[in-house]
């Protein structure tokens, strides 16, 4: 029996007047085994509320969540992580994937692994770095971000097995960059290239976010999927977002 996963990312409830309440009410949890939320859900104190809304709506499902970059804005990594730990304690169906995995029970059920992923250190030009809000909005961002990236890369390269489902916020391959962003000076902050790992370890699915463009592509035997919403009320909302996007795996 296949698992049914619903994929959402980059909901950015901080841009919603009601902080996502009406949006969550419009979602259909019927028959969903796992709701996958691939980061950038809400910022600051709004994050626990947003997680609770989704967990209540999907009370018969698991909610698998990886942190994006925006959840850390205006806070420290330690404070944000503690907020999510507390939310997972208060919502029994919430699973925070932080270099960790869940194994669904039952015949044919697959393992789901996840991490934010982030990006490796590289000698960027100052203009590119100045354009990325992460460096100014997240307290103690450097060198913390590079350690988190190293940790995630090592974990995924070591743990992924054929047929697994992987969830990250950041893009795991340059192949996943939308055509309009090819050549952008910001791509090194959006992509951590795991292409060799994908080809070698052969997960069945890799689900991601961060970019605000839908993506359906293939690397070897792995389907690469992204279903982001974007910023409500702006030019950066994804016109191809599908709030009913369900994958059978």
PLM regions: where:
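Glycine/small-residue-rich loop that forms an oxyanion/phosphate-binding "nest" at active or ligand-binding sites
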Residues: 75-98
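Binuclear metal-dependent phosphoesterase catalytic core
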Residues: 2, 92, 104-106, 178, ...
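Active-site environment of divalent metal-dependent phosphoester hydrolases
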Residues: 12-18, 42-48, 70-81, 101-106, ...
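N-terminal active-site segment of His-dependent metallophosphoesterases
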Residues: 1-65, 71-79
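Beta-strand-turn-beta hairpins that frame and shape the catalytic cleft
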Residues: 1-6, 101-114, 119, 163, ...
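Charged helix-capping and loop-helix junction motifs
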Residues: 49-53, 79-83, 184-192
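Active-site-proximal loop/helix segment associated with metal-binding centers of metalloenzymes
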Residues: 111-184
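Active-site neighborhood of phospho(di)ester-bond hydrolases with catalytic His/Asp-centered motifs
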Residues: 7-9, 35-40, 64-69, 95-99, ...
